[in-house]
Amino acid sequence: MLHNQQVIVKVVNKEPASPAGFFIYCDLLSRYFPLKQLMRQTFIARRIFFIFLIHFRDEYMSPQNNHLQRPPAAVLYADELAKLKQNDNAPCPPGWQLSLPAARAFILGDSAQNISRKVVISPSAVERMLVTLATGRGLMLVGEPGTAKSLLSELLATAISGDAGLTIQGGASTTEDQIKYGWNYALLINHGPSTEALVPAPLYQGMRDGKIVRFEEITRTPLEVQDCLLGMLSDRVMTVPELTGEASQLYAREGFNIIATANTRDRGVNEMSAALKRRFDVETVFPIMDFAQELELVASASARLLAHSGIPHKVPDAVLELLVRTFRDLRANGEKKTSMDTLTAIMSTAEAVNVAHAVGVRAWILANRAGEPADLVDCIAGTIVKDNEEDRARLRRYFEQRVATHKEAHWQAYYQARHRLP
């Protein structure tokens, strides 16, 4: 036994040169002791843990390996939030991190403070949303898919609460315990209902901590689950019948509120009750109507995505013009268009950004160049057509009747690439 311990001490005191070496040492240790007996040697366990921290820290905690696919707004705009909070002299509503003017500047931008604009929307609409939340009313954002409702709710929650992590994703499988609270069943069986056994869900956490809770796609949630919000929105209290005493009721702290989103295309799937509708102020988020604004947004957003993907080239302006013009020509924006002109697919600005990103990636990875009209034809088909044969015919008709009439070089190159359509 002593000999084995000496061998182990000798092994763990030699620092491995790489994380792979760490696993080799663990394998050597396991040859001398069973796992349970090995971990009883506390000095060995501490040494292994120390080696793990030292040699895995640089590899797995470095910026190169800690890139998030989509950083939350609180991380992405941390410097702007800190600057706004430092310069914020206006009074804040109870429980808010920023005042209303500062929250407005965070969303719409402020050139004087070098704060970027994060969404294209009417300033008056943002002001109405902030006032609604400041008065304690729930806020519901409705609109066509891809109109930045989720982004807007994230920005609002970040400006008010400092983060937007308390999010409920609505769907047919969403249950009440995913919204309010659940239980650690091991503790529940051993010790019975208690606050230690309770597992808080986003709504419980938001009420407890005084933060904004986001409820995405609320109309896709079953009606009986939607109605569990009634008490929280009216009386601001959540009852936990399994507990007794003060723990059986959770009263919302200042700052708590709910921002819900709903797509107009989901209307009728799970229609909200009249009682729940009364507890929300509804704000409609419209598509971007101005061509120049939409083009600018697609250009900036796609450039950011391409940089995140390690692509050194932006999509050329001419290709972006083709993309945005195609989307605007084929989408139903309330303009006078027949069913022969518009597609059933969601031709949103968000989809246009995704297509622009795909064009840049395709051109650089496959051809080592910037995007061209032919790349756009390849990438646009999967977004527009999907599995609808009528949309496929409409897209081909659009190329023959609309694209062919443009005489500019990039439009003609776009037309000549029509044979790439599926």
What are these regions (language model features)?
Residues 364-422:
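C-terminal engagement/docking regions of AAA+ P-loop ATPases
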Residues 62-309:
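AAA+ P-loop NTPase catalytic core and its hallmark functional loops
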Residues 11-24, 38-48:
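Positively charged N-terminal leader segments that act as targeting/secretion signals
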Residues 3-6, 25, 32, 37, ...:
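Low-complexity, intrinsically disordered or signal/transmembrane-proximal segments
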Residues 136, 163, 190, 283, ...:
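Amphipathic alpha-helical interaction segments
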Residues 43, 49-52, 62-89, 407-422:
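Accessory N-terminal regulatory regions that flank AAA+/P-loop NTPase motors
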Residues 302-370:
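Conserved AAA+ ATPase small/helical "lid" subdomain
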